[in-house]
Every structure is written in structure tokens, then in C-alpha cells.
């Protein structure tokens, strides 16, 4: 009996269980669970449609982490003049080892020192040192372990097309940046910014480029972004001192002069040259240079955000007593792709130098986000979350699902008689609060009564509240989970590249084409869009809202073979053949480009098919999924090597197939797959799974695939024809073979 009594639950524990069960079935819990489920559904759909296309931070990464100062990177520029510089991708410099045809900016990113064993969040403030045919690049790298700047150095043996990270040249206990490197009397010096030390230091190379020793302290002031130049018999030092009284940060400039870069230094009579208005470019933006006898100074326009852009000034007068400069055109075209460009939001530093050949080379840093972006995104995200929670709570109160009761005794303190005199003021205050809360409670009750009535106005009110809640859930997901909001390009072996997009269309699809061009021109790696115009009156290039050049190639004959016609004006090896009725994210396009660069001998696309059977039969992607593999990629959305693919398609051996395609106005993509398979014994196709893709061909009256069954019957006949001419297609390749999961 005693044992049985011990096992029987006590009355208090039973009451606790009953209370918990009642709470679980309470209207408040049910309402909150339903609201959370609805918010999760809305957030999940928004994440899938929008946020999943962004390049999200890798939780396992040791470098390139979100940073409030930005995500700075460094690009290369060339020209016959420092006033007419073009980015490296327009110069046709290539690197076959990384499938970069051409190499594209940025050439150095946070990944450069990170992969070299020095995890970094960004690289900025680049300075060149030219030594014969070798370029050395000194730059600030924000080290992850200390969260401060160190000076890194890289070397290029091919005029800047490829860079080798050599290591950290200078590391102090304080933040370092702006590594101004120069040569004087056969010694190489570095004058970095280290304003936290409150002095301007000069270092000398003991074993260039990695070993340096302190030569001397030039000036006992925390000078910012100091630049030297020898001009008209004197050495001039341009810098900013933000500790000077009455000046605006990033808006001050002062000048000093000396007979030697080692000092001593005297102040210019007009100091400070600038003291207000951050848009004037007072803060230095790189090395001063002399061109055709004139002296030029780059400065930073810091209006709106720090380092918004570089402004160039031509110095018309520089003496010990006078100074005058006027703005001139920098000569570098600004990025138009916003966050999808590596320098789309800001660029604040340039170093241009003349080579022995007479040409000019320059390095410039850039960022795709404004200063403080990661902090702002977190703030907006949490605000959206809190507003959504507040709206849910409000609706719960109004609908009666959530209630809040404060007993009257809460406002009456329990005290001993001896403490009454001390407690009376608190008691009076509590009574006031109680009266106010009672009044608020009556108003809430009245509001609940009004809103509980079933009227059109109340229904509209709650619909508006629901819409605001949905918007705020999307805001929270966008800013908290969306990274920096950019659809960034991927590197292969540390380098970026570009591709040309080719689409074939007709007059009847012009409306579709305009949407197509506007969307895809914003993708970071797109160099040019070529429109193969097969039929009808063609538009002009300026009819499109595009951030890249659009070229209309008018064909004489309306034939699907025109899709793969050789085009000597295409400047990239990689071509993305994409139908104008397919829309997908730029991020998925960039993934496909990266996969193609890993295997440029393959066709890499987004629409797989499995062709088998006896006789061969054409089926949809669902069949390939059932077979768990594929052996054909549709060229309506596929990357290929234009030099190989186009020449192969227009070779003599492909003539019979081309004639069949022209006759049936179909199957050009199948023919290309057979030609690839016939040319190699190794793998020729690879699939990339897009997050989502919209195919509007079924909505078009001119699409050849709008009648699905007829379309499939024609393509089945094509398979039999091409197999008899060119042999079988390759074996099946399984889905999900890539480690990154992009082919699932």
C-alpha cells in the first residue's frame, strides 16, 4: 500500500499538469502559434523567391565576414593617359589557368590574404611600386583576429593580370592603412597612416618588400591619408588633421613642404586649405601625379557616405604662400549595376603610375555597400521583426485572443505601520498610475468593441494591418538573412571574368525582350547582350534599359541556326545562350558561369533531359528526375565556349544536321548536344539547379513549344535523325554529384 501511495501523483502536481494542458489549449497560445506559423510561411516564401538569390555569408568562413566598414576590393586599370583609364576586362587580358577570358575586376579581394593564411574582411587603399616589369601592390587588409588594418603586399609578373599574395609587410599594435610607398636616394620608404599612434611615421625597407624598420617620426600629429609629391624643386606633403579645432571630419586638407621627404616640414601659409563640406574632396584619395607638366590630386567625395567616390583636381598654383586647384574629369566610367558591381556603391582611392613603355597603369579600390551597411541592415531587420510582433499582439488583444489582467493589489504596497510615512508618496504615485491604466483600459475596451463589429471598414482595417505585418516580416527576413543584398559573381582560382549573353528573338516578342535585357544586364559578370534578330523590324540599342552594351545582330534568314552563328565582335570566350522567355536570378546565372569556368570544355545549363529508349524518345525534366540523372542540356539556357561550339556547329560535318534544323524550325539545341558528344569521349554536359526559373513560353503565341505534344513529337524525330548521323549521346550523369549541391 505504501508503494502504491508513493506512485500516486500529489494534488498540486496534478493541478500543475492540468494548468499546463489548459494553457496549451488556451486561445492566446493557439493564436500565437497560428501567427508564428503564418509569419514563417510568409518569410519562407520571401526567402525562396528573393533572399535565396543573394550571396549569403558562409558560417564556416574564417575571412570575408560582414564588416561595418564595408567589403572593399581592388581593381586594375590601364590607359595611354591617367585621364583615360579603362578596367582590365576591356583590355583583353586573359588567364587560361583560371578560365578567365578575359580577366575582370576586382583582381584582389578579401579572399586573397585569407587564402594566403591571413584571414581578412576587406582590402583597400592600394599603392603600386613598379620595379622593372614587376608590379608590387601594397594595401590595407583588415585582419579578422585583431579587427584592425595591417599592410599586405602582393606581386604581379604580368602587368596586373594575376597576383601572388606575399604576406604582411607591416603589422603594428595599432591600425595601419594608406601605405604610401616611394623611392628616395636608392632607398624604398613607406609612410602608412597610423593616426591612433598620434604621429606620422616613416619606415624604410630592409628586405623589400616584406621587412621594414622605423626610420623616423616625420610629424607629431595624427595625420590622415598623407601623400608626398616632388614638384617645382620641393617635396610637398598633403594630409588631413581631424583634431584641428573647428573643422568637419573628412573635409579638412592641409599642406606642408620641405627640401627632403625626411623633413623637417613647414606648414603652408593657407592651412587648412579646406575645413568644411565633405563633398569637395578635401581628404586625399591616393597618390598625386604629374601628367604633361601639370600636377593632379585625387580626393575623396565623402558626401552621403564615407569614400563615396574619387574626385580629381588639377593643381593650378602651388607655392609656399598660395594654393589653387580646379576639378577635372577623372576619366573612369562609374559602375551602373549598384550592389551587383564590386565598386557599385563607392570608390575612394586611386594610384596611377607611368610604366617604362609610356603607358599608364592604375589600381583603384571599390565597395558594393555603403559605410555601416551591415549595422543598418541589422537595425532595419530587428525593427521589422518588432513591428510584426507588435501588430500580432495588437490583433490578439483586439480579437480577445490575448488578455492582460493586473490585479488592484498590484498598485497597493503591503507595509508595516512603522513604514507608512515612507511609503505614502509611492502609494500616491501608484494610485495615479492605477487611474491612468483604468482609463486606458476603458479606451481599449471601447476600441475592441468597435472593431469586433462585422463591418466593411473593420474588415478593411484588419486587411491593412495584415498587409503591414507581411511587409515587416519580409523586411526582417530581407535584412537579417539577406547578406549584403547583392547577387555577387563567383571567383575561380581567385579571379573574376565575364561572359556575353546571346538571345534570339522576333518583333512579336519585343515587350518580353525589354524585361529580359533590363533584368540580366544587372548581373555582375555580363559583359554584353547580343540580340539575334531573326524576323521583323528591329529596335535600336537605345530602346533598352540596360547597364551593359546591347548589340542588335540582324539576320537575313529566319533560322534557328542563327543562334550559334560565329560572331567576331564577341569579346569573351564564355557565352550564355538564353531564351528571352526565361527569367532566373542573377545569382543562379553566376553559379552557372562558375561551374562552366571549372570545366570550359562542357556545356553547363539549367534545363536537364534524359534521352533513352529504343527508339530514342524526348521527354521532360520530370522524367530525368525519375531516372535520377541526365545526359543532355537544353541550350535555351546554357553556357558554352563560343570559339569551340560555334565553329563546331558551322563545320562541314554538321551541315546535314543544320539543314534538318532549318527545315523543321526546331532541335538546334539537340544538334549541339550531339556535336559536343561526338567531339569528346569525356563528359560534355553539366547541370546547375536554379533556385527558381520562370518560363513564359507557354504564354506566348509565337513560341515553338506552346503545343507541348507536337513539340515533343518533332524532337523525338530529331533524336532519331541525329543519332543516325552522329552516334549516341553520352551516358547518364547523376544529380547531386557536386559537393556544393548546386546540381540537386
Curated annotation (Swiss-Prot):
Its EC number is 2.4.99.-. Disulfide bonds join 667-718. GO terms for biological process: lipid glycosylation; protein glycosylation. GO terms for cellular component: membrane. Mn(2+) binds at residue 581. It is found in: Membrane. Substrate binds at residues 534, 558-563, 579-581, 609, 665-669. The active site is at residue 669. It is an enzyme of class 2 (transferase). The chain crosses the membrane at residues 31-51, 378-398, 460-480. One of its GO terms (molecular function) is metal ion binding. Belongs to the glycosyltransferase 64 family. PANTHER family: ACETYLGLUCOSAMINYLTRANSFERASE, GLYCOSYLTRANSFERASE FAMILY PROTEIN. Essential protein. Glycosyltransferase that mediates the glycosylation of glycosylinositol phosphorylceramides (GIPCs), the major sphingolipids in the plasma membrane; acts as a HexN(Ac)-specific GIPC sugar transferase. Responsible for the glycosylation of a subgroup of GIPCs found in seeds and pollen that contain GlcNAc and GlcN (GlcN(Ac)). Maybe involved in the maintenance of cell-cell adhesion. This is Glucosamine inositolphosphorylceramide transferase 1. It comes from Oryza sativa subsp. indica (Rice).
